[in-house]
Amino acid sequence: KDGYPMVRAGREKGCKIWCVINNESCDSECKIRKGKKGYCYFWKLACYCEGLPANEQVWTYEKNTCKP
């Protein structure tokens, strides 16, 4: 599946992973989660992954628990 991966622990748990460096950092984050590739999306504000496993949680507006 495709989507925005989320921070798994800490103060920003449930938030999108911010794209603070470049496409390579997002690609690495996605591959750690067994995705095919990742890149900066939405005006370079968040990482977006393609090809994630079905059980990987991704950020959705409806289930947003981010409270940075």
Swiss-Prot record:
GO biological process: defense response
Family matches, as InterPro entries: LCN-type_CS_alpha_beta_dom, Scorpion_toxin-like, Scorpion_toxin-like_sf, Scorpion_toxinL, Scorpion_toxinL/defensin
GO molecular function: sodium channel inhibitor activity; toxin activity
Residue ranges of domain LCN-type CS-alpha/beta in the record: 1-67
Subcellular location: Secreted
Database matches in SMART domains: Knot1
Principal place of residence: secreted
Origin: domain of life: Eukaryota
Disulfide bond positions: C15-C66, C19-C40, C26-C47, C30-C49
GO CC term (a single one): extracellular region
Keywords: Disulfide bond, Ion channel impairing toxin, Neurotoxin, Secreted, Toxin, Voltage-gated sodium channel impairing toxin
Tissue: Expressed by the venom gland.
Record note on domains: Has the structural arrangement of an alpha-helix connected to antiparallel beta-sheets by disulfide bonds (CS-alpha/beta).
Family: Belongs to the long (4 C-C) scorpion toxin superfamily. Sodium channel inhibitor family. Beta subfamily.
Function description: Beta toxins bind voltage-independently at site-4 of sodium channels (Nav) and shift the voltage of activation toward more negative potentials thereby affecting sodium channel activation and promoting spontaneous and repetitive firing. Is toxic to both insect and mammals. Induces paralysis in Acheta domestica crickets, but does not induce death, whereas intracerebroventricular injection into mice causes immediate death (at a dose of 0.05 ug/g).
UniProt name for this protein: Beta-toxin Im-2
Naturally occurring in which organism (per UniProt): Isometrus maculatus
